[in-house]
Amino acid sequence: MVEAERAENSWIASETSPSSSPVVIESSDFSITDGMRDVSGFGIASRPQLDKGLSENNIGFTERVFSAAGAAVLSAVTLNPLDVVKTRLQAQAAGMSYSHPLSNSIGRMAFFGPNMMFADLRCSPSCARAGVEGTVSICPPDCFQYKGTFDVFTKIIRQEGLGRLWRGTNAGLALAVPMVGIYLPFYDMFRNRLEELSREKAPAMTFCVPTVAGSLARSLACTVCYPIDLARTRMQAFKEAKAGVKPPGVFKTLVGVFSEVRTANNLESSLHNYRGLWRGLGAQLARDVPFSAICWSTLEPIKKRLLGVAGNDTNLVGVFGATFSAGFIAGSIAAAATCPLDVARTRRQIEKDPGRALMMTTRQTLIEVWRDGGMRGLFMGMGPRVARAGPSVGIVVSFYEVVKYVLHRHASS
């Protein structure tokens, strides 16, 4: 939604002078709440116009949540296959086997116990390497080893069907809607308040406001929605127990996660066991907070440059293009930089030993990943992660702003 790693943009207000001098775009003009469009001709409203009508042009909290929810749904449904591919690559690197149950790797699979969700995997009848085990045509073990992004796509489609690429979409939607619905509106609120404080107390620190506000809002959203994210990762990483049998959904997956640590017989132990639903939250925050910081610090300069090139001719389409492009580039850079933390988060979420899972820290997990796979292990799944994060940030940011604008125009009329 998820990795979605999320960002938000703003309508840009440009101040023009009576002369024909170039347009100057100030950093203070990049505001979600302050930036409203001139309804006539879809032009960009000047700063004085915004200051004059700020109270009546403010977007309400409900409208912001609705806009964010729409952006989250579009992003989650469109980009879920890349999230599945990334999770499969990272899970395999962590030691999870995707081999056929009848293959010679059954000993390693037994480690996960009889309740492990494995599909009755079969290659296509046209596979020249398939052998026969009884009446079942199966491939050798390496047919079920993922070798790269494209290889994961082809093998999932061939062995499990095209629909498996949208495995966990319901959990992704259940996660993305509240996640983005909390993140973007609260980002608006935090930033507006911090901007007021910085202008009064420390004007030189105003440039840090978007980074701080984004980190606070992201931390809040991640903490509230984390159990759903844990269920989504489990659903994407594991395969079904039997072919043709519907796999467990979000609720059953969450129950399964909790059941792994439900061995307590007193209140203190019961409260301790609830920590299992937030397993890996530290790694999630360690990934998402830097992601937000990198994304915002990259997005704003790119957006400013693109809108500066457009100058006075910037309209709705131009703002949408600049917003999406800036979000795409910033999201891609942030996703690549934080990939090791995403690998650590995935490894902690799919850990099957409850005791070990609760004791693992992000630092220990990163050291373990480095020991097992070196630099390649730390950046496992970076391709699909970047391919997902770039469009995801661009879609969420641009869609959020466009829907807010449409809702504002409808309310004004």
Curated annotation (Swiss-Prot):
UniProt-listed Gene3D superfamilies: Mitochondrial carrier domain
Q: Which domain of life is it from?
A: Eukaryota
* Gene Ontology MF: a single term: superoxide dismutase activity
Which Gene Ontology biological process is one annotated for this entry?
response to paraquat
The record's tissue-specificity note reads: Ubiquitous.
Q: What induces it?
A: By paraquat (methyl viologen).
Entry's transmembrane regions? 65-85, 170-190, 204-226, 284-304, 316-336, 378-399
Instruction: Name a GO CC annotation attached to this entry.
Output: mitochondrion
SUPFAM superfamilies xrefs? Mitochondrial carrier
Recorded hits in InterPro entries, A to Z, give: Mitochondrial_sb/sol_carrier, Mt_carrier_dom_sf, Mtm1-like
Please provide the record's keywords in A-Z order.
Answer: Membrane, Mitochondrion, Mitochondrion inner membrane, Repeat, Transmembrane, Transmembrane helix, Transport
Tell me how this protein sits in the membrane.
Multi-pass membrane protein
Q: Where are the Solcar repeats?
A: 59-193, 205-305, 318-406
The subcellular localization recorded is: Mitochondrion inner membrane
Function field: Involved in the mitochondrial activation of MSD1 by specifically facilitating insertion of the essential manganese cofactor. Has the ability to activate iron regulon in an iron-dependent manner.
Family statement drawn from the similarity comment of this UniProt entry = Belongs to the mitochondrial carrier (TC 2.A.29) family.
Read off the PANTHER family from this record: FI19922P1-RELATED
Q: What is this protein called?
A: Mitochondrial carrier protein MTM1
Name of the gene: MTM1
